[in-house]
Amino acid sequence: MLAVTNIPYPSWLNPADNTWQLVAATLVGLMSLPGLAVLYGGLVRKKWIVNTMLMVFVGFSATLVVWMLWGYNLAFGPQSHFGPTGSFWSGFIGHFTPLSTAGAEQGQAVSGANTLIPFHFPTATLAYFQFVFAAITPLLFLGALVGRLKFKAWLLIVPLWITLVYCVNAALLWGGGFFAQKGAVDYSGGYVIHLSAGVAAFVGAAIIGPRRWQDRENAFPSNLMMVAVGAGILWLGWNGFNGGDPFYAGADAASAVLNTNVATAVGVLTWLLMDMFFSRQKKPTFLGAINGMLCGLVAITPSAGWVNGTGAIFVGLIAATIVWFAWNYLSRIRPFSKVDDAMGVVYTHGIAGLVGGLLVGILADPGMVQYGVAGRHFKGAGSFSVGGWFYTHSFHQLWEQFLAALWIIGWTAVGTTIVFTLVKFLLGGLRESDEVLSLGDVAIHEEEAFPEPTFGEPLMTPSHIHPDNV
């Protein structure tokens, strides 16, 4: 028999950190599959359930392929240095190189611009963790486009958008690029993910055009139970979303998880109270609670590890209040009233992400320390903190957050316009025909989520699994 010996881990590998990072990544992945697939499936009309859920699966898959071939190193690899050190172009983007060798995957993970100390887990762990963040971003703005977007168009939009928009934004804020060097922070993606998704949703929906008026007039959720399941997966999955971003299983991860749940709970209650006292119906609604949940989750994302518990309460309260008024009043004003955002992505992700990012510059507590960072504002070896106006009486951090937000909004709008216009040119249009739009899933996929055969007729069976074809 072979003698039992200790596994020869590399000296830099910490099993606890590696395990937590993989668990956190899996939680974030579950937010997409099945989280968003089930949530969206419950929100759309019955005839669009299959198409919408399949687009979520396809977007997730396409992003992973892009991520392995060039996306990861483009966003988080060594900087290309197109300009002088310290300039915008010196920290603009990484390299178009694949992550495909044994050494690349199993070596110690490091940040491309050396803004973080070397991690205690392999590059494969970091690459997968960053992938699930990249994957969920186009899936978020998909929510604004459902019910009319060509399936073939989606196959092209995802890889192009990830490459042109997401990787650039991630490199500039997370990969040690220009805005990271200037001091802007985005703890888990309020800007890189949610603000950019909101902008892409607005631009994409404007280019594609609205749904058929019949579909807009009858846009009732097909299944609130599916919505509840999907929303629950999102909420608890967010523990990995924000809790994994310290990259270590430490106190800062625990604080991020607690703050995330506090802000979310406050967001739910705030939206319901707004509905009860200020809406036309004066009644609490389940969909309203889901909107409040999203506001809290999204708004705390850029600040989860920077604010204390009291700050988290204010983040949830302020974000839910602002987004509630925006949803109910801004949506009536041009140009918002002319853009058919099917699921309110512009509001619950775009505006909530912007509010949360700016609140970092106001509510960030210098006493909240993030460890493992090899850069500025040291509070002991390998750690730093961020101070908002409330504690420092300085608007410096708020200014840096504002400038980063302007970039995200501007570049995402330009990049999304380029991607959608190019795909429209290549395919001769982005919308399905009116005939297809009237039928939905049956016309596009020959499948239905809930088939209802008429009396005396057989259940509709997709042609590719029909007995005659077996």
List the model feature ranges, each with a label:
Residues 2-470:
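Glycine- and aromatic-enriched membrane alpha-helices
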